[in-house]
Amino acid sequence: IYPAEPERDFIKTALGPALHRNGYQDLKLIAWDHNRDLLPQRASVLLNDSAAASYIWGIGFHWYETWSGTRPLYDNVKQVQQNFPDVHLLFTEGCQEKFDYSKINDWALGERYADNMLHDLNNGITAYCDWNILLDQTGGPNHVGNFCFAPVIADIAQKTLHFTNAFWYIGQFSRFIHPGAKRISSSSNRSDLLTTAFINPDGSIANL
């Protein structure tokens, strides 16, 4: 993994100045773009340096810290948001690994998306992006054999599309939480019931 200090120095001495010098200062520079496990440490090194921080619009992260058997480290997102409230936090990649066509209807697929989205939204993220919206019936194509699930699976031979439950889970969020929405307080009366709420620019309230 690219260490924090070289990334910081590259941004403040090379990439950031080059973008500004060539008229691209309006581009939104997203740093890190890896898993939640090292998110606080990486953000601290990058954002506590005022020169580097002046070029950084946001910090991106993924959900693959669970590869080692750990639970999702949602509190790391909250910690960074509290320490650097003016920096945008973005979930930039996530997918269900180890594709198995016989499991494309498993509820665990959509539930993983919902669990991650609810926790990360409540911890202050700005945006959420899936990795692959569409893959084929092998979970590819992929040049290194990293075959994964996707919200939509295309059966090339049959020329059909299968919309997994992940597609509808993600759609539930994107349908009701509009661009420019602001998160508002929400709570549930059960410890295992997750919820989040937003007020949209038109004044409507989305409670998921």
Please place each PLM-identified region on the residue numbering:
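Active-site neighborhood of glycoside hydrolase catalytic domains
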Residues: 1-97
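Extended hydrophobic-aromatic, low-complexity segments
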Residues: 71, 139-141, 208
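Aromatic/acidic polysaccharide-binding cleft in carbohydrate-active enzymes
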Residues: 88-172, 183-188
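Short, solvent-exposed polar/charged micro-motifs at secondary-structure junctions
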Residues: 38-43, 101, 140, 193-196
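Glycine-centered loop/turn motifs
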Residues: 178-181
